[in-house]
Amino acid sequence: MAQGSRRRKVVLTAGAEGCSSSSGPDMEELLRCAERDLNIDARQLALAPGGTHVVALVSTRWLASLRERRLGPCPRAEGLGEAEVRTLLQRSVQRLPQGWTRVEVHGLRKRRLSYPLSRVLPFEEGSCSPETLTRFMQEVAAQNYRNLWRHAYHTYGQPYSHSTAPSAIPALDSIRQALQRVYGCTFLPVGESMQCLSNVRDGPSRGSSACPSLLRAEALLESPEMLYVVHPYVQFSLHDVVTFSPAKLTNSQAKVLFILFRVLRAMDACHRQGLACGALSLHHIAVDEKLCSELRLDLSAYEMPSEDENQEVSEEKDRTGVKSEKDGEGRPGCPTCQKELRGLVLDWVHGRVSNFYYLMQLNRLAGRRQGDPNYHPVLPWVVDFTTPYGRFRDLRKSKFRLNKGDKQLDFTYEMTRQAFVAGGAGSGEPLHVPHHISDVLSDITYYVYKARRTPRSVLCGHVRAQWEPHEYPATMERMQTWTPDECIPEFYTDPSIFCSIHPDMPDLDVPAWCSSNQEFVTAHRALLESWEVSQDLHHWIDLTFGYKLQGKEAVKEKNVCLHLVDAHTHLTSYGVVQLFDQPHPQRLAGAPALAPEPPLIPRLLVQPIQEATGQEDISGQLINGAGRHVVEVTPCESGWTRERPTAGEDDLEQATEALDSISIPGKAGDQPGSSSSQASPGLLPFSAPSGSRPGRRSKATGLDSGEGDEGKIVLPEGFSPIQALEELEKVGNFLARGLGSQLEEPEKPQAQPPVYLQSLFHRDMQVLGVLLAEMVFATRVRILQPDAPLWVRFEAVRGLCTRHSKDIPVSLQPVLDTLLQLSGPKSPLVVKKGKLDPLFEYRPVSQGLPPPSPAQLLSPFSSVVPFPTYFPALHKFILLYQARRVEDEVQGRELVFALWQQLGAVLNEITPEGLEILLPFVLSLMSEEHTAVYTAWYLFEPVAKALGPKNTIKYLLKPLIGAYENPCRLHGRFYLYTDCFVAQLVVRLGLQAFLIHLLPHVLQVLAGVEASQEEGKGLVGTTEDEENELPVPGPGSCAFGEEIQMGGQPAASSGLGLPDYRSGVSFHDQADLPDTEDFQAGLYVAESPQPQEAEAVSLGQLSDKSSTSEASQGEERGGDDGGAPVDKNSVKSGDSSQDLKQSEGSEEEEEEEEGCVVLEEEEQDEVTGTSELTLSDTILSMETVVAPGDGRDREEEEEPLPEQTEGKEQKILLDTACKMVRWLSAKLGPTVASRHVARNLLRLLTSCYVGPTRQQFTVSCDDSPPLNAGNIYQKRPVLGDIVSGPVLSCLLHIAHLYGEPVLTYQYLPYISYLVAPGSNSSPSRLNSRKEAGLLAAVTLTQKIIVYLSDTTLMDILPRISHEVLLPVLSFLTSFVTGFPSGAQARTVLCVKTISLIALICLRIGQEMVQQHLSEPVATFFQVFSHLHELRQQDLQLDLKGCTEGQLPEATFSDGQRRPVDPTLLEELQKVFTLEMAYTIYVPFSCLLGDIIRKIIPNHELVGELAGLYLESMSPSSLRNPASMEPVTPSAGPEWNPQSGSCLQDDGHSGTFGSVLVGNRIQIPDSQPQSSGPLGSISGVGSGGLSSRNEDNALKRELPRSAHGLSGNWLAYWQYEIGVSQQDAHFHFHQIRLQSFPGHTGAVKCVAALSSEDFFLSGSKDRTVRLWPLYNYGDGTSETAPRLIYAQHRKSVFYVGQLEAPQYVVSCDGAVHVWDPFTGKTLRTVDPSDSRVPLTAVAVMPAPHTSITMASSDSTLRFVDCRKPGLQHEFRLGGGLNPGLVRSLAVSPSGRSVVAGFSSGFMVLLDTRTGLVLRGWPAHEGDILQIKAVEGSVIVSSSSDHSLTVWKELEQKPTHHYKSASDPIHTFDLYGSEVVTGTVANKIGVCSLLEPPSQATTKLSSENFRGTLTSLALLPTKRHLLLGSDNGIIRLLA
């Protein structure tokens, strides 16, 4: 049984590919031995596609035991069928069942290693890499001397000396020892005998590999017959990269060189251990997504087959009979698998091999693998089966085109082309690349074809999940019509494919004209070999494998394949492969053009005989070279090609003999042909109908016209004299250009030389040269056989290198020349074809160097390979990354720290191409669970510094977001929230990008949302209208490093359509997704073009727009609420990884999804006593600034922290985050802090209350529960109050910083927005977000009331009443609006609302309550009456007249009829109980006194209910005042679940801070401490009516802050928070905000730092000053400089910042580089000639560190601040005299610099080449200033009063502005606008995009005195810095 399965596998993997390799028996032997020695089931073994090794499916446990040197039987894959196992062994399959993996088994036959191997070891060049130039030269000299001596000896001395043969050892022993040294482990004996025990007695059982660049070995095994090396499975090789993913290596020579570098390292290690690498190919270099390469040795090259074994192989091949059917029938000579493609093509063209065999060979060359569902061989469908033997298909069109039609393909191409243009080339989205065809044979089609033979489970997994057997095509006719893909070989060879193994699926029916499956297969095969197919098959080859796959021909034929044009960079092992780039020659199916006999020359006199002989015609059948019958074809005149001169007087006998000779079967002339009348131009004329007669001429032979011309020669119809030459040219052109082949020369027998190890090493180097050339000419060498001998590969690539030398990259030309001797002596190389011989002999000394070796090529002093200087450091970095296995956080930190120590050496010399190699490793570290935080902390700053802001945002933003959103709690997580790290983020990302994209994720930690992974999933899109605000899964939603394979789409990060770059980076791909598009769930979703606001960025994109009603309300409110207006598009623009499939109003789905919100919160609730305690201390430590002195009792009363690591970490984390937010709020200033920090915090506040768990009351650990602890009114905060503590703390700190207006102008409008009822939705519409928003609104209002002054409170009291209290009460008392969390949420809201109303009552007094709060109080109490009336009516509602969907109505005592939802009555009764009546009536009767009768009409009813509650209490309860405490939570300024942690001195907390008994207030003595944790939460409470600090409890003063808003600052802030973030225009209102006096001379230049918290100014007083930009005062205050730099000797005319190193550059004729933090001078650059001073300076943008300087002699110089001396020096003026350089500007990319001269001339220079791109007279006057903008735009101003906008390489300006009176001498840029300034003190704003129009404002003397000299704009803050000639700088808005 095992033998049969083995034989079956061999046939499937090797034979069915159309060729049985000569090593087939060898590989069968390897399969047999592996099964026996390794105990692996034969079903789980398969030959690798190249036939070099065996792939095995093994269990991970078996592999683990093998690594431990224990070899047991490998478990069988019991749960998998044979077909499934066969599929899992295919290369394109990446997903394996749990617990299974694949390995590679490489074997060496011991009997073939019996030859002796010379002991001569290589020279010492590889023993140690030369470290100095002297050492390198010494090594070279010594090797040259030895080589020359030995060469002379071998040439002249050895023939005459009778020396003994060199010492040698058996190759087996040498190889065994070398393998053990290389792989660091010993051989494990396996099999029946233990003969090899003696060879492994010493050495470690397992060690480290000699070189990490070598593919590691899992184990070395030895049996009596074999040596085995077991490798991990190689998923991708370099061959896959160059074949299927060539875009991964495009535009980067460094990547190719780095692969070569690592290969050389591996080869060097092997050579030093005495092991040759073998005949390597691209398949032997394993690569991963990061292009990290590892070398896999070719051990089979060591085997030397003997002659008797060769004979055995051929006999075995004959016995198996594979040749007759699989190798191609009737094929003469040796197996074509060993021939070069040239012979194969010629054999097919001349009919010596069958169509089937030839097509299978092409499939094999393309890498297609039998049985691989993604990459199975393809053959054409040739007929449609509708008629007997079918109608032939048009092979000039692809099957996809025939099925879909031209219109469909044109539409697909045009649509994808438009999307491609709109999205930008290289946008990374393959679906939007213009194409016609997606695939030639998809895996689904493959399984449909083989559905009858494939297990049901496989079909359900790949075709359709639900088993529908009758949905599969039932007949061959239906199959051919249905599929757009090509056919598979099984329909031509395998009759069993029609037979179904499924009982409910019928067999696949063959056409009616066939009686059996076998007959159909035979007929189908005959059709494939028919003459009709043969004559057009070359067209199909061109479409499938040839030149019509790419270029104009592909577009013309509608054959553009997606895989070939999408420029994908992910690795894949299948796709469409182009073999030929020239038209394929046609098969010569008719008579040859040059036959042995000449054609008949017809004359008038032989006409009767011709007619007679025509009757003797016999139809013949063509027998092609494969020995199969072809459809009937008859010969015609075009087949008669032999020409014999015949005179006009020749007799009839000669003509008759000629005619008779051509119709005799068996002669050369009997091959059929055809008339050329039906042949296409340029095709062979063999397509006439089979019924034509060869001897008969048509009437169109020209006889009529030539009857009178006796001597005229008339050629036969269709005969072309040059036809044979044309055919020869076509074939020759294809062979030369397409195949690069040449005439084969006879081999000369050569004696077998002895095998020297040194020769093997030379052979390795030659193999390396061949391999490099194959990588360069990957598209041209696909025509070579996969198992072509090395000498064939060498000759092919050497010819390519000679003919196409310009295609070789410059960096590889020297190494290819050295390795392959391309430019050697004129005498041709003698190529040796032995298996162990070098291809040729290297010269002893070539160009002064010895023969190449890995060590020589790796030497930094060798010029053969130009390896960059950073390669060794980068290689060391990657080795360290690969060597460490990180299993916990400690190891993760150690690894990152070690990498950080090495990173400096890498980045010092690295280039952008090197960063492309390094960056995927950094991104991988930032995406791994145990290293993400530490990678961000240690590596972000140096890597971002090298990348620059643009690339940092592109590549590092997504992993940064993932690190912040990752739910895992790590010890070092707080590092990400330190102010120093956030400062780095601001600097490296840019302030605007940080605020928009990253800040919302940073702030999430305050709300605790990041701690709940389940919540993050549950909040993803409960309804469609909530998708913009609920959390969406980002990198933190799944395990770190987990590849999301579903659909092949990388998980988009939250809020941003950011691609995943871990698989590769290319800086050349700069066409990113435009800002107007977002990548969402694989589709483009249109979005507003402005920068995405924080509202649309992740967490809940936690905005408050939780329903359609709220969104519409936001639109109505506009900017009034202090939040940005919500536009309808933004609701749909949130990035989500889920499809937009939730429908609006689907409350059932909403409830189900919200149910999973709080899975982790329940666990948090169980440890409330631990984690909340730590939270309390954190919150209070934050608030010590807000309320100084109030926390003095905290340390005394504080409980010791529980000894739980998680609690401590959470405390540290929140402490750090709150501290960072306080620092950031001050750093950003009032407007930016309000727009970005405060708004995000307000949104987060709502998320703190989402879900039922966060609405549960909590119990503090130090409380002994009262008697009624089970009561829902137990006085304790809800969990949401605990979670929201840090958020409230930060919100109040912002209010403390900037004053009371923050509370009234920003917080209160947002509260109104939260509680506003929806206008467009049904009254019952209340979701979990809205519910949480109500709780958050009431909680925040409690905080606000405490900190408001009396005057302010009275001013806004009507707003609070109408916009907060009444809307909340409308939800709370509604009979039709249900709460998602039921009675619990309504109870919490009720309790909080009572506390809020009571707090306001205490603040304003009884009279004001009656005047302003009577309506809210009455509304609240009225609900008791309504419920009482419904209870008295027995809940009988008026159901009459209620149509379906309408609610019944009830009539109440006030005469009004109101709708009532019967399902909500129970919920309301649970809330408004007797206890609730008692709880609210007693305190309000105390607070309101007698006016309660006027305000509350039903006070008597509520009083009765309260009395009933008192009566229901037991006497014991009445005696215990504590148990009678109403436990209504109340709002206070600060709260904490821990007793004594409150900011107030009072520790008591009753309903309102004390126990209320009857109508008096009683302070209980029995409770020295609060019995509940609400002491500091409860509003009124917290000592609200206590005897201590009563004023502080009800009212707190906001401490005065130096940054408090007043005057102009307040007016500007009020305006600014109402402006939409989507407004891209700059508005100048001339509001004076601050003054900066100090300079004693005119201010010449002003420049803001990138973080916008400081700015620099340079002046005539020879100083540069650094000023802070923090707000002070009311707009009239003056600010002193933070630092003064006074090292200049002249007037300073330029100051700027080098962004990458954060240095300041200033110039006064000499350039000074200094540190802005210390003022220390770092470098001074003086002009080379004092008579030629510097006139203009510009700094290069990050990541560049260069300074550009222009001198008065029109010379441009570049200086790198890190290195001494000049970098470059370019002359700008040329032959002209343009004057002095007045201004310089560098493009944002740093690729060009533009200089403006005093003559108005401008010059554009390429900084990379130094070439002048353009010079033009731009202005008529002096150039005053130039600035460069993104998009190759230049803006220049001149003394001719003009401001002009240019495109870099366009002649005419795009816009031209003219100032009427004064020139624009200074300007700055704001987005697409220019802000200008003139000497007349006028500020103007004009657009770069719209037609010329300018808004101008004259500066008033009150706001600005003096003359404007300089201007700078703060883009994020929207401020202007204006410098004047009096030395004062002013900040205006």
Curated annotation (Swiss-Prot):
Biased composition, class Low complexity, residue ranges: 668-693
GO CC, alphabetical: autophagosome membrane; cytosol; early endosome membrane; endosome membrane; late endosome membrane; lysosomal membrane; mitochondrion
Acidic residues: bias regions: 1145-1166
Annotated protein name in UniProt: WD repeat-containing protein 81
Region described as Disordered: spans on this chain: 305-334, 663-714, 1038-1057, 1090-1209, 1517-1544, 1565-1590
Molecular function via GO: K63-linked polyubiquitin modification-dependent protein binding; phosphatidylinositol 3-kinase inhibitor activity; phosphatidylinositol 3-kinase regulator activity
InterPro entries on file: BEACH_dom, BEACH_dom_sf, Kinase-like_dom_sf, WD40/YVTN_repeat-like_dom_sf, WD40_repeat_dom_sf, WD40_rpt, WDR81
Biological source species: Rattus norvegicus
Keywords: Cytoplasm, Cytoplasmic vesicle, Endosome, Lysosome, Membrane, Mitochondrion, Repeat, Transit peptide, WD repeat
